[in-house]
Amino acid sequence: MALILGVESTAHTFGIGVVRNGKILANARSTYTTEKGGIIPMDAARHHEQRKYGIYEEALKEAGIKESEVDAIAFSQGPGLAPCLLIGMKFTKEIAEKLKIPIVPVNHCIAHLEIGRITGAKDPVMLYASGANTQIIAYAAGKFRIFGETLDVGVGNFIDNFAIHAGIGFT
């Protein structure tokens, strides 16, 4: 009955989930928002830095566990915004060293596909459109494969730039 923490910090959200044998026990998170414009990576990273310990305590409380019960900690290693990813990685290393537990790096895109597989989707295909990344990804022949990707402006960057020019905030 492995008890796993998962740390998400790829962009606007800092979150910590707690899972035991496929059952979600907690999903605590805080989202960086702006009133005007898109995500400012350093501001999002500051948001994560300021909230990480509170989110951690909230996740443990929501799951009804003590940190000493945690068997391993996973974290999103990318893709994502480098300053935000760094906060999540450092936090993960800190907790893992404190608890003397293993770290499991996770690819954010693959995690989305795995959720599809875990929930019973047969051969899930994903259009991943986030920031500079726009890819068509699927599981085929025993591997995750990229079947296509943009060679110029990513859909996420296009949407961010449009929102900035239109004066739309990020919420």
Where are the predicted features?
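Short acidic/glycine-rich loops and adjacent helix/strand connectors
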Residues: 1-171
